[in-house]
Swiss-Prot record:
Result of altering S316C: In strain: cv. Glen
Name the UniProt record assigns to this protein: Ribulose bisphosphate carboxylase/oxygenase activase A, chloroplastic
Lineage: Eukaryota, Viridiplantae, Streptophyta, Embryophyta, Tracheophyta
Species this protein is from: Hordeum vulgare
InterPro entries listed in its UniProt record: ATPase_AAA_core, P-loop_NTPase, RCA-like, RuBisCO_activase_AAA_helical
Subcellular location: Plastid, Chloroplast stroma
Main location per the UniProt record: plastid
UniProt cross-references to PANTHER family, sorted A to Z: PTHR32429, RIBULOSE BISPHOSPHATE CARBOXYLASE_OXYGENASE ACTIVASE, CHLOROPLASTIC
Pfam families: AAA, RuBisCO_activase_AAA_helical
Family per similarity comment: Belongs to the RuBisCO activase family.
Length: 464
């Protein structure tokens, strides 16, 4: 506390402000006489200057009288404090508050590698290039250029189209608004078209908040295409095609049914996947509206993806290459199913130790928590064995077309015809029981075929 005193007679008190300092606040207080009467002009005057400390202005109760909150930051502060019932999941939907020019500290300091991997998973360079260029181009203002709003990625089944898209989205920091083919049909006419507009405007709302976003529709041809003459073409199919065409033509003027607002919305790129875009309405897939990309992974792409699938299983790169080359005609999801099949032995052991009658109590609402396994050892021999088993199941589906047989004739008494032809009807299952079963060679193509045998004992001899 610094103070300055001066006494004057017949003139008002004055003290140079330079003497008091720049941070000093001048306070003039008139002296009051001892009798409680006001002072006159010639009375003694006291002038005091108080040093203002900036720290004293931080009042923790200031928010009671003045609004000092920041809703954007409060959402982050409330995580873990506010009941989760009232908290949206982080990074999903329009509930994630985003600052206008940068993201929160937890996301704003994130650095991306400009390589074609994400989280240890491989992204095909051609796929990444097409998707990144399309998304970036739709957020740019290019002079006198009409940019297609929709990117259609199509190709064979199980080739990782959706998964590769998700990896690119994660690498770019995009949380897409998702839709599937099942949402493109409804019992109420016009509902799917309205839903597309709602999802599009939701993505536009996220872009307006400063968060890059897009609309991602899975398997568009399954919901809006015509799969042969037996597929009924409904009003909703027509409206879905017409809505996507309208959005592609006017991406900044997307209105909801029953209302019209001239205020423009941000442009939202649309990414769709499918297996055959020739089933779609031709004007929708024309070049000005949809940019098409046929995805057929090369051998290097398949090897790169499979290395990501087996990265936690200590499978060497040479083994992955051997597995991929052994099954050249299989889709990429075949190798994911192959890895999952290896865990069958562990599950079988767990069932034997737990007991079939106790499985429900152990797996559903158990106090012991989820079941955990030791990671099984994966060898090339075991993976190839399970791979051939999967291929055999595929061949069975293609060979045994029972629907054609049942539709063409009354196939009664022929339920096991295919199994008898292939020699797998008797098999080795009968040996697991306690009843005496005659064993022998049950393969009709073997030299020592025994027609009386009802269980194969592995003694078949062949002439090559």
């Amino acid at each position: 506390m610094a103070a300055a005193f001066s006494s004057t007679v017949g003139a008002p008190a004055s003290t140079p402000t330079n003497f008091l300092g720049k941070k000093l606040k001048k306070q003039v207080t008139s002296a009051v006489n001892y009798h409680g009467k006001s002072s006159k002009a010639n009375r003694f005057t006291v002038m005091a200057a108080e040093n203002i400390d900036e720290k004293r202005n931080t009042d923790k109760w200031k928010g009671l009288a003045y609004d000092i909150s920041d809703d954007q930051q409060d959402i982050t502060r409330g995580k873990g404090i506010v009941d989760s019932l009232f908290q949206a999941p982080t990074g999903h939907g329009t509930h994630e508050a985003v600052l206008s020019s940068y993201e929160y500290v937890s996301q704003g300091l994130r650095k991306y590698d400009f390589d074609n991997t994400m989280g240890g998973f491989y992204i095909a360079p051609a796929f990444m290039d097409k998707l990144v260029v399309h998304l970036s181009k739709n957020f740019m203002t290019l002079p006198n250029i009409k940019i297609p709003l929709i990117l259609g990625i199509w190709g064979g089944k199980g080739q990782g189209k959706s998964f590769q898209c998700e990896l690119v989205f994660a690498k770019m920091g995009i949380n897409p608004i998702m839709m599937s083919a099942g949402e493109l049909e409804s019992g109420n006419a016009g509902e799917p078209a309205k839903l597309i507009r709602q999802r599009y405007r939701e993505a536009a709302d996220m872009i307006k908040k400063g968060k890059m976003c897009c609309l991602f529709i899975n398997d568009l041809d399954a919901g809006a295409g015509r799969m042969g003459g037996t597929t009924q073409y409904t009003v909703n199919n027509q409206m879905v095609n017409a809505t996507l065409m309208n959005i592609a033509d006017a991406p900044t003027n997307v209105q909801l049914p029953g209302m019209y607002n001239k205020r423009e919305n941000p442009r939202v790129p649309i990414v769709v996947t499918g297996n055959d875009f020739s089933t779609l309405y031709a004007p929708l897939i024309r070049d000005g509206r949809m940019e098409k990309f046929y995805w057929a992974p090369t051998r290097d792409d398949r090897i790169g993806v499979c290395k990501g699938i087996f990265q936690t299983d200590n499978v060497s790169d040479e083994s992955v290459v051997k597995i991929v080359d052994t099954f050249p005609g299989q889709s990429i999801d075949f190798f994911g199913a192959l890895r999952a099949r290896v865990y069958d032995d562990e599950v079988r052991k767990w069932v034997g130790s737990t007991g079939i009658e106790n499985i429900g109590k152990r797996l559903v609402n158990s106090r012991d928590g989820p079941v955990t396994f030791e990671q099984p050892k994966m060898t090339v021999e075991k993976l190839l064995e399970y791979g051939h088993m999967l291929v055999q199941e595929q061949d069975n589906v293609k060979r045994v077309q029972l629907a054609d047989t049942y539709m063409s004739q009354a196939a009664l008494g022929d339920a096991n015809q295919d199994a008898m032809k292939t020699g797998s009807f008797y098999g080795k299952g009968a040996q697991q029981g306690t009843l005496p079963v005659p064993e022998g060679c049950t393969d009709q193509n073997a030299k020592n075929y025994d027609p009386t045998a009802r269980s194969d004992d592995g003694s078949c001899l062949y002439t090559f």
